[in-house]
Design a protein with these regions (language model features):
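Membrane-embedded helix-loop-helix hairpins and adjacent transmembrane boundary segments
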Residues: 1-639
Length: 639
């Protein structure tokens, strides 16, 4: 195939090199350093701007975020470096059908804001992909690169909490969009626009493939989302139904996502943030999938390699090298300076995912586990535990890199989605039934979870025992693995869980009214009944501080915050003894000692009213209809 004049010329030294000797130039490194400094400055600025010395301030950003950083953080938390590598790789290998995951997410994130978030409020309730860029473009030691990245990420996550995470996510979203849109422009220019891509994609064959083999051929339905229900890689019934359940689980119940909407100052701002994220979810098709397809056109011998031995030499993966499509495009197509910008984009995608996971996991461990083990833990203790847990996650992340590197398949994104389809449906079905069917009880939910997860784990183990054969090998896997697509298995798993939960719930005692009050869609407007209004069978333990002041421990509905009972005198003595180094560390962690200690008082419950200003609510609802209409049009156009 003849390359266009604007196409990059193949490297003569080693035609099999995935990343030829081209590396980042000094200008690229300067852009990358400026990015790190800018992100660090924004992260540290947010630590000063927000209150970090309370549980609500650290884990929920004080519940005072407006819509645009919430929306940007939702998008940045979802779109990690695995999206850039995985979506582009799947686009190069099989066309744009993988875009269905992104279009599906549009509806799910809107359901979060309009359906699930009111229930949450009423109830008060990716490393390897980044390593590909860091290691290959800078030629650094893998662990050195990851340790440095994690250190910068952990610094502002530990210091600033969720506020720092959301503000830096907003910055990184802007950087990602600028860089990715720039690369998209260069990509389409290199192949002659969309028409040129449609023409050249089907001619993008590796020169080293066997003439009598179908391996490495572009799919005939590459430019369609809906595909054959029996023989395709993503059957259309599975896309419509099997894909929706894991999508609802991720967007409507995952701690990483929901925590951002709960940080909004009110329900209207949460809806606005979700709308912004929904509009941004249209972009991955154009900034990731299409560039991946362009990469196959420009570098067919490497991105579309079909011979296992050659693929092993090219990317150390005999199953295929489609996952190098995006990195290859960045390093070969962009001029000096812009390569540094795209490197910053990939690091931004990775760091936004890391900060989200670090903060959310720290929240779960501190508030759900540690607070249960130590119900009388002081607020300062909870702050320390949350930050120390982030450090532990950093160490686990470093140790986990080679495990992911060794286990990933030919298409990283598809590999991730298949695993999700085995484990997420039971959790999603149980959660949805609990929100919309008041008859669902604990025994039904437990039975459905156990059976569903057991079946999912069995399929997961079978997939590991019987991996998918290469194109040139016969498929001798058991029928349940060979013939049941993972999206169809998601539908089966959801149905089994639904029947189990319904049957067991009907055959056992229903939950009481108190158990479902303000915790389902139909009871979300029930009057609030505080725990303190219910007489306790045992007296509340009273603690006497050193200055003789009695202090009763109070429990918050969501966070169970126990006020610290250290005396004023002791606090003042500790302040005098603290060195400047200790004071600096305490300030970074949001635990600096105050000169005048405020008397212990009840922490304000984290409650956001369900009331909305009528005009704002109307504008949001109109925007919702417009967004859904756009999504339906895109589904129909590319179906």
């Amino acid at each position: 195939m003849e390359s266009s004049p604007s196409s990059p010329q193949p490297t003569q030294s080693d035609p099999l090199a995935v990343f030829p000797q081209r590396t980042l130039e000094p200008a690229d490194i300067a852009v990358l350093v400026l990015y790190f400094l800018f992100v660090l400055a924004v992260g540290l600025w947010s630590t000063v701007k927000t209150r970090r010395d309370t549980v609500k301030g650290y884990f929920l950003a004080g519940g005072d975020m407006v819509w645009w950083p919430v929306g940007a953080s939702l998008f940045a938390s979802n779109v990690g470096s695995g999206h850039f590598v995985g979506l582009a790789g799947s686009g190069a290998a099989a066309g744009l059908s993988v875009t269905a995951y992104e279009f599906n997410g549009i509806f799910s994130v809107l359901m979060l804001a309009w359906i699930f978030l009111p229930i949450y409020i009423a109830g008060q309730v990716d490393m390897y992909a980044g390593a590909i860029f860091i290691q290959q473009s800078l030629h650094l030691n893998l662990y050195l690169a990851i340790v440095g990245l994690l250190a910068i990420t952990a610094l502002y996550t530990i210091a600033g909490g969720l506020a720092a995470v959301i503000y830096t996510d907003a910055l990184q979203t802007l950087i990602m969009l600028i860089g990715a849109l720039t690369l998209m422009g260069y990509s389409f220019a290199a192949v002659g626009g969309m028409e040129g891509l449609k023409e050249k994609y089907f001619l993008a064959l590796a020169s080293n493939r066997s003439g009598n083999s179908s391996c490495g051929l572009p799919r005939e339905d590459a430019f369609h989302i809906f595909r054959d229900p029996l023989t395709s890689d993503l059957p259309w019934p599975g896309i419509l139904f099997g894909m929706s359940i894991p999508s609802l689980w991720y967007w409507c119940t995952d701690q990483v996502i929901v925590q951002r909407t709960l940080a909004a100052k009110n329900l209207s701002h949460a809806k606005g943030g979700s709308l912004m994220a929904a509009y941004l979810k249209v972009l991955p098709l154009f900034i990731m999938v299409f560039p991946g397809m362009v990469s196959r056109v420009l570098f067919p011998d490497q991105v579309a390699c079909a011979d296992p031995e050659i693929c092993q030499k090219v990317c150390s993966n005999p199953a295929g090298c489609s996952d190098i499509a995006y990195p290859k495009l960045v390093l070969e197509l962009l001029p000096m300076g812009l390569r540094g910008l795209m490197m910053a984009v990939m690091v931004a995608a990775l760091m936004s995912s890391l900060t989200s996971i670090f903060n959310s996991a720290s929240t779960i461990f501190t508030m759900d586990l540690w607070n249960h083990l130590r119900p009388r833990a002081s607020e300062r203790e909870l702050m320390i535990v949350g930050r120390v847990f982030v450090l532990l996650l950093v160490m686990v992340s470093i140790l986990w890199i080679p495990v992911v590197q060794a286990s990933q398949g030919g298409q990283l994104f598809i590999y991730i989605q298949s695993i999700s389809s085995y484990l997420q449906p039971p959790v999603a079905v149980v959660f949805i039934m609990g929100c919309f069917w008041k008859r669902t009880n604990e025994k039904g939910a437990f039975s459905g979870l156990i059976l569903g997860l057991l079946l999912g784990l069995i399929r997961l183990v079978l997939d590991f025992i019987y991996p998918q054969p290469r194109c040139d090998q016969p498929d001798e896997r058991p029928a349940v693995v060979r013939d049941v697509h993972y999206l169809y298995f998601s539908m089966i798993l959801s149905s089994v869980t639904l029947v189990t939960v319904s049957t067991v719930s009907w055959c056992t005692a229903p939950p009481t009214q108190e158990m479902v009050s303000r915790l389902t869609w139909f009871t979300r407007h029930d009057p609030i009944v505080l725990k303190e209004q219910v007489p306790s069978a045992t007296p509340v333990p009273v603690t006497v501080s050193q200055n003789g002041t009695p202090e009763a421990s109070s429990t918050n509905i969501q966070f169970e915050i126990v006020q610290e009972n250290t005396s004023k005198t002791h606090s003042c003595d500790m302040t005098k003894k603290q060195s400047k180094v200790v004071k600096t560390i305490l300030w970074l962690c949001g635990m600096e000692s105050k000169g005048k200690e405020e008397p212990p008082s009840r922490a304000d419950p984290v409650i956001v009213s369900l009331e909305e200003i009528p005009l704002v609510k109307t504008l949001l609802d109109i925007n919702l209809i417009v967004c859904i209409s756009c999504a339906i049009f895109l589904w129909g156009y590319f179906a």
